[in-house]
Curated annotation (Swiss-Prot):
One of its GO terms (biological process) is nicotianamine biosynthetic process. This is Probable nicotianamine synthase 4. The lineage of its organism: Eukaryota, Viridiplantae, Streptophyta, Embryophyta, Tracheophyta. It comes from Hordeum vulgare. Signal peptide: none annotated. One of its GO terms (molecular function) is nicotianamine synthase activity. Synthesizes nicotianamine, a polyamine that is the first intermediate in the synthesis of the phytosiderophores of the mugineic acid type found in gramineae which serves as a sensor for the physiological iron status within the plant, and/or might be involved in the transport of iron.
Length: 329
């Protein structure tokens, strides 16, 4: 067995053990035990690794799929918990730093804005943006609106009405960003004509848990978004925390893939930048010619400088912040 295979086996074994421990928890609501296990999971998954989750053995694949479902449930409970905590303040937006991972959203949103400006320059100052899968803590929309897109209107969509109610409460005291932020309870599969009104659509990592579901969502967006509109799709190239997105599925969905970014820091989402292709009207979806990879050239795969050492220190600090915030709440 070569060194790379040993590294992959060691990582899969470690994550399998964490999955078993997480699955035994009586609840995934925030608690010291939950926070510690998921912090260990993130610490294990974030460093660059040669593992290819598409080539895992069936048993490991089943473990990975179960782990992603647990991560989704835990993330929802974590965000609901902190959304309620923030809503207790007179102006919740003044206290977003109470959420231990808020800095990750700042970094991810900055990265996405810079990628849009670089690869889709005509869309980096959009008039209207849709965020699909915004959840009870719509930090991404807020950071983009407050720091990068001061004139843009944001429509946030989520399946969960309770999540949208929580999100709405966070903006009640803000007359600037709050006036440009709206929340809608809807399934993306039911959105049609409204999708054509957006210059940019952001697709959250947890929308479409299985690969075939993700591909259906992307094809639906490709059928209804305006020609030239940009798609920003988040996914988990590290594979154990979030579903992965195959760029080929984005191409088949009617988009031109412009760039793929795999961050090497504590941002756990990879990002794909794509643009709705005019070809979809000529050839149709499912023809294999509805979209393509970056104008017939090799798609740029970009990555910020690695700062894993800083990330380990950040994770330790965040574990302490979790404990302190829960005591205060």
């Amino acid at each position: 067995m070569d060194g790379q295979s040993e590294e992959v086996d060691a990582l899969v074994q470690k994550i399998t053990g964490l999955h078993a421990a997480i699955a035994k928890l009586p609840s995934l609501s925030p608690s010291p035990d939950v926070d510690a296990l998921f912090t260990d999971l993130v610490t294990a998954c974030v460093p660059p690794s040669p593992v290819d989750v598409t080539k895992l053995a069936p048993e490991a694949q089943a473990m990975r799929e179960g782990l992603i479902r647990l991560c989704s449930e835990a993330e929802g409970k974590l965000e609901a918990h902190y959304s309620d905590m923030l809503a207790a303040f007179d102006n919740p937006l003044d206290h977003l730093g109470v959420f231990p991972y808020y800095s990750n959203y700042i970094n991810l949103s900055k990265l996405e804005y810079e990628l849009l400006a670089r690869y889709v320059p005509g869309r980096h100052r959009p008039a209207r943006v849709a965020f699909i899968g915004s959840g009870p803590l719509p930090f991404s929309s807020y950071v983009l609106a407050a720091r990068h897109l001061p004139d843009t209107v944001f429509d946030n969509y989520d399946l969960c009405g309770a999540a949208n109610d929580r999100a709405t409460r966070l903006f009640r005291a803000d007359k600037d960003v709050g006036a440009r932020m709206s929340f809608h309870t809807a399934d993306v599969a039911d959105l049609t004509d409204e999708l054509a009104t957006y210059d940019v659509v952001f697709l959250a990592a947890l929308v479409g848990m299985a690969a075939e579901d993700k591909a259906k969502v992307i094809a639906h967006l490709g059928a209804h978004m305006a020609d030239g509109a940009a798609l920003v799709a988040r996914h988990g190239a590290r594979g154990f925390l979030y579903p992965i997105v195959d760029p080929q599925d984005i191409g088949r969905g009617g988009f031109e893939v412009l760039a793929v970014c795999h961050p090497d820091d504590d941002v756990v989402n990879s990002v794909i930048i794509a643009q709705k292709s005019n070809d979809v009207h000529e050839y149709g979806l499912g023809s294999g010619r509805g979209g393509r990879y970056a104008r017939g050239t090799v798609v740029p795969v970009v990555s910020p400088p690695c700062r894993f050492g800083e990330m380990v220190a950040d994770v330790t600090q965040k574990r302490e912040e979790f404990a302190n915030a829960e005591v205060a709440f």
